[in-house]
Amino acid sequence: MHQQKRQPELVEGNLPVFVFPTELIFYADDQSTHKQVLTLYNPYEFALKFKVLCTTPNKYVVVNAAGAVKPQCCVDIVIRHRDVRSCHYGVIDKFRLQVSEQSQRKALGRKEVVATLLPSAKEQQKEEEEKRIKEHLTESLFFEQSFQPENRAVSSGPSLLTVFLGVVCIAALMLPTLGDVESLVPLYLHLSVNQKLVAAYILGLITMAILRT
């Protein structure tokens, strides 16, 4: 005897549901957007029943709110916004598509679709552009702040070591030269001509370094 091939039992709520798009945006100033289409796909080897639920059903008309999808087929669900008022701008509504096997009532899977009413497509594009520019400026400021301390360190003026060397060189040049007999400075502080030339050379380098900063 041939045994009948049994389909594996599906767990409630775990079946992936394929819907496109997953977000609906209606624009008040564009009537062509007041009617939009959801497409439900059935890639499986068995037929599916579907049902469309909504958090605010009084604001929408759903054509084909319930029905069936054949195996490896799709069905279009038309959704019309019938309450286009400014008080609904920016309010997020949700549609839920539940699917089940034709022979059973339990929901095998579900998918939520977000719906939003906006005043104008142009305003939406303008807001997105302003947001993009703001993010770009924020990033620019972030990088400038990151490198600012380094710039300050470079342009903060001569270091203490440079100033100290400059003072030493000036003091060396002011000391008497070897051979000056009439000096009150002790003899061991008398410098030779070569030593003073070295001090003058170093002082010149220090002066150039200070001027560059």
Curated annotation (Swiss-Prot):
Topological relation to the membrane, as annotated: Multi-pass membrane protein
Designated name of the protein: Motile sperm domain-containing protein 1
Membrane-traversing stretches: 159-179, 191-211
Domain MSP residues, every copy: 16-143
Entries under Pfam families matching the protein: Motile_Sperm (PF00635)
Keywords in alphabetical order: Endoplasmic reticulum, Golgi apparatus, Membrane, Transmembrane, Transmembrane helix
Short sequence motif Nuclear export signal: positions: 205-208
Task of the protein: Plays a role in differentiation and/or proliferation of mesenchymal stem cells. Proposed to be involved in epithelial-to-mesenchymal transition (EMT). However, another study suggests that it is not required for EMT or stem cell self-renewal and acts during later stages of differentiation.
Coarse class of the protein's main subcellular location: endoplasmic reticulum
Cell compartments where the protein resides: Endoplasmic reticulum membrane; Golgi apparatus membrane
Domain of life: Eukaryota
A Gene Ontology cellular-component term: endoplasmic reticulum membrane
